[in-house]
UniProtKB/Swiss-Prot annotation:
It comes from Pelagibacter ubique (strain HTCC1062). This is Valine--tRNA ligase. ValRS has two distinct active sites: one for aminoacylation and one for editing. The misactivated threonine is translocated from the active site to the editing site. NCBIfam families: PRK05729.1, valS. The lineage of its organism: Bacteria, Pseudomonadati, Pseudomonadota, Alphaproteobacteria, Candidatus Pelagibacterales. Residues 810-875 form a coiled coil.
Length: 875
């Protein structure tokens, strides 16, 4: 290889182009299948760290199964992202001086498609930068013809079964976009607010009942005052009427357990049309529902005329002013509370009573719960199944209509008397209408579109060709695993399970792996406002896609958020260089890569040891990947490559490579190359670019497959024997000597004299046989079996007593003093941590990861203190 260092910018685009040109991402026929569907990113999106983690995990699994001879499909695609895309294109048109309402729906949709064709592949190209090996020939889009056909079929069939219906209910309403939105599109923000105390006059009395509210403007739609049945303060008022100030309407004081005696005054104004909890109270008590706002958030004709047409927040100011003037106002207090904002419009969301289309999610949830209960679909980590059931057991009707133009238009048409005809297309709707009216009539199509989550709920089977093309459905459905974030378990995962069970009577995936969040190095959520957002593309450019992938995978511990720092990525970039340098070492030492298809002869101890380590590492990686312990699998691969192979085996091998024993040298070259080849295969699913580059440069494969990506996963078993134990003893001795030098602040490169007190001839023969290796790696000048008259330190390693000799001018007392000072410092730090951990308040209030880190720090310091004690004792 020409480069001393690995230069990723010369490699990654080139390698990815090779893979694509050779169609390596397509499934190759085999008896067993492995399939994954990508969580479709929004077509408006750009790669963020959550995408990077999610897709690194998927690509690891896909590449691993491909190398294990599975017919592997990774189905890619993007989501049309109704609200996000429409808002973005509207903004662009407005900047160009174009009003969407003037050009009309059809022309506007054309503009959206134009934007999609120009910008829609940006995030897919960014996924390629990460190394994702999706079958791009099957790239799907939720507005594609086949996906649209699936959506229509599902809607029509669910409507026929009575599982889709139209109803008037309270929904999250965006007054800027003028559409219903899902809970996931609502951002609950903690803000500085005020709570207002207002008196409502009691009928036929000079008394008042005082309520507290953060939204006095909604009193225009009040239909009751609620008090708790157990609250004795209001028992004498239950059943009486009060007058709503300003409005003059009489409303009743009722009992309902929703009223909390500890909140506010204990008396609660009920506005069923503009609060979700109030709506439930209204349903239980058969209260009138009065909508007082327009779709744009202005006061409507149901309010006193002087308020009609006012913006809701302007109305609030006017109401407070009038309440004060009429002496109904008691006081106001500053508070902090959570207020719902639309994540696209940045406007405050209004609970709004409106007619919408709904799915009877409760009925669909029955099979969806059974499939998880029966373990046909399993969550990893398992505790996420509890979250799944909590949501499913409290499921509400799902509002699926949106007042947008971009999306799947609802296949419903209205007759002259507003009768609804649901059909696949207008022709069928007209035929149904003709049968109903006994004549041809004009129909008007419902202008609303479906919630984006409706179409993405069909993703696992619609992308495979359902309903018309069953070949891929039969082969790859159910999919093997879904990799997703916890925030969409209900919005997406549950709905895919519901639709999969309803239409294919099969779970859409066997496993659901739920990964954690990627946060900054301090454990804070990344946000633009905090200025702590780390762009994955910047890290890829600076350190390589492989370094970023390996960082994320090595930190993907179940239930623990990833605390990402640039230094970690930089550290794993060094790992790539270590691998690159190992390859250069093999080339320099004439290792032959063309003769390593079969397991080599293993007669030399270090060769037996590294082969045993290889098989053990392979087995650990397989188990950890099966258990979705990506962090442990990455650790296994890293430790074996960096420490076992590079730090130890290659160093041990130098004593043979630089000897005169040609037969031994040939075996070491063979084993070095063979094990390195297996390392490339083991590492490839984690770091595909650098491993493929080394593989292709060395022409490792002569089976015709050429590419590492298509190589077979390592196989083989190996039983450990005494020869392997000997190598491990050498490593243990050298490690202890190096640590001992470090404790004594002796230069690691300096040579020392050692004598060994052994208890058997067998042990003596071990040191005789391995004297050359021990001297070279342990930086030992002389190895004696007798005592010397010099300053001495002793240590025990693997049952043997070692005496380390120093030059006459070494001041052992000064060394002892320095060690004691350091030991005392560590002990002080231990005491401080011990006090913190004994403080129940700290343990209960501090984040779990902080407490765990303190425990780890304590144990590390304890080990250091004990180690120094042993060292001092040996001096």
């Amino acid at each position: 290889m020409s480069n001393d260092k690995y230069i990723h910018t010369d490699v990654e685009d080139k390698i990815y182009s090779y893979w694509e040109k050779n169609n390596l991402f397509k499934p190759t026929k085999n008896k067993k299948q492995f399939s994954v569907v990508i969580p479709p990113p929004n077509v408006t999106g750009s790669l963020h760290m959550g995408h990077a983690l999610n897709n690194s995990i998927q690509d690891l699994l896909v590449r691993y199964h491909r190398m294990n001879n599975y017919e592997t499909l990774w189905q890619p695609g993007t989501d049309h992202a109704g609200i996000a895309t429409q808002a973005l294109v509207e903004k662009k048109l407005t900047a160009d001086g174009i009003d969407k309402n003037e050009i009309g729906r059809e022309k506007f949709i054309e503009k959206v498609w134009e934007w999609k064709e120009e910008h829609g592949d940006i995030i897919l190209n960014q996924l390629k930068k990460l190394g994702c090996s999706c079958d791009w020939s099957r790239n799907a889009f939720t507005m594609d013809e086949n996906l649209s056909k699936s959506v229509l079929k599902v809607f029509v069939e669910l409507h026929k079964k009575g599982l889709i219906y139209k109803d008037k209910k309270l929904v999250n309403w965006d007054t800027v976009l003028k559409t219903a939105i899902s809970d996931l599109e609502v951002d609950q923000r903690e803000v500085n607010s005020k709570i207002y105390y207002i008196q409502y006059p009691i009928e036929a009395s000079s008394d008042f009942i005082t309520i507290a509210t953060t939204r006095p403007e909604t009193m225009l739609g009040d239909t009751a005052i609620a008090v708790n049945p157990k609250d004795d303060r209001f028992k004498h008022l239950v059943g009486k009427f009060v007058t709503v100030p300003i409005v003059g309407k009489k409303i009743k004081i009722i009992e309902d357990e929703y009223a909390d005696p500890e909140m506010g005054t204990g008396a609660l104004k009920i506005t069923p049309a503009h609060d979700f909890n109030d709506y439930e109270v209204g349903q239980r008590n058969n209260l009138e529902i009065i909508n007082i706002f327009t779709e744009g958030g202005k006061v409507n004709e149901n309010a006193p005329k002087e308020y009609i047409g006012l913006d809701r927040f302007e109305a609030r100011k006017r109401i407070i002013k009038e309440l004060k003037e009429k002496e109904f106002f008691v006081k106001e207090e500053n508070i902090k509370n959570k207020v719902p904002y639309g994540d696209r419009s940045n406007s405050i969301i209004e609970p709004f009573l409106t007619e919408q289309w709904f799915v009877d999610a409760k009925k669909l949830s029955i099979k969806a719960k059974d499939i998880v209960n029966s373990k046909k679909t399993n969550f990893f980590p398992a505790n996420w199944s509890k979250t799944y059931f909590q949501w499913m057991n409290n499921i509400e009707p799902w509002c699926i209509s949106r007042q947008l133009w971009w999306g799947h238009q609802i296949p419903a048409w209205y007759g002259p008397d507003k009768k609804i005809f649901v059909a696949i297309n207008e022709e069928e709707a007209k035929l149904d209408a003709k049968k109903f009216y006994n004549k041809d009539v004009d129909l008007i199509r419902d202008p609303d579109v479906l919630d984006t989550w409706f179409s993405s709920g069909l993703w696992p089977f619609a992308t495979l060709g359902w309903p018309d093309n069953k070949e891929y459905v039969d082969k790859f459905y159910p999919t093997s695993v879904l990799v997703t974030g916890f925030d969409i378990i209900f919005f997406w995962v549950a709905r895919m399970i519901m639709f999969g069970m309803e239409f294919l009577d099969k779970e859409p995936f066997k496993d659901v792996y739920v990964h954690a969040l990627v946060k900054d190095e301090k454990g804070q959520k990344m946000s633009k406002s905090k200025g702590n957002v780390i762009n994955p593309l910047d890290l890829i450019e600076k350190y390589s896609a492989d370094a970023l992938r390996f960082t994320l995978l090595s930190m993907a511990s179940p239930g623990t958020d990833v605390k990402l720092s640039e230094d970690r990525v930089k550290g794993y970039r060094n790992f790539l260089n270590k691998l690159w340098n190992a390859n250069n070492f093999l080339i320099t030492n004439n290792c032959d890569f063309s003769k390593i298809d079969e397991k080599p002869i293993l007669s030399i101890n270090i060769n037996k040891w590294i082969y045993a380590e290889l098989i053990e590492t392979k087995n650990k990686i397989e188990k950890n990947l099966k258990d979705y312990r990506f962090d442990e699998a990455a650790k296994n691969a890293y430790q074996f490559t960096w420490h076992s192979y590079c730090d130890w085996y290659l160093e041990l091998s130098k004593t043979i490579l630089f000897s005169e024993d040609e037969k031994a040298k040939d075996e070491v070259r063979q084993v070095s190359a063979y094990v390195f080849k297996q390392i490339l295969i083991l590492l490839h699913p984690f770091i595909p670019f650098v491993t493929e580059e080394i593989w292709l440069n060395n022409k490792f494969d002569n089976t015709g497959k050429d590419f590492l990506m298509l190589a077979n996963w390592p196989s083989g078993e190996f039983e450990r024997d005494t020869s392997i134990n000997q190598v491990e003893k050498i490593i243990s001795i050298v490690s202890e000597l190096r640590s001992f030098k470090n404790e004594l602040s002796v230069s690691p490169g300096s040579f020392i004299d050692i004598s060994i007190e052994t208890v058997s001839k067998k042990e003596q023969s071990f040191f005789t046989e391995n004297e050359i290796i021990l001297k070279k790696l342990g930086r030992i000048k002389n190895l004696y079996n007798k005592d010397l008259d010099k300053p001495t330190a002793t240590l025990m390693v693997s049952g043997d007593l070692f005496k380390v000799y120093f030059d006459e001018d070494v001041d052992l007392e000064l060394i002892k003093k320095n060690l004691t000072t350091r030991q005392n410092k560590y002990q002080e730090e231990m005491n401080k941590i011990s006090q913190r951990l004994a403080n129940k308040g700290f343990v209960d209030r501090a984040p779990k990861d902080i407490v765990d880190q303190e425990k780890t720090n304590y144990n590390n310091l304890k080990n250091d203190v004990e180690r120094i004690s042993i060292t001092i004792k040996g001096l």
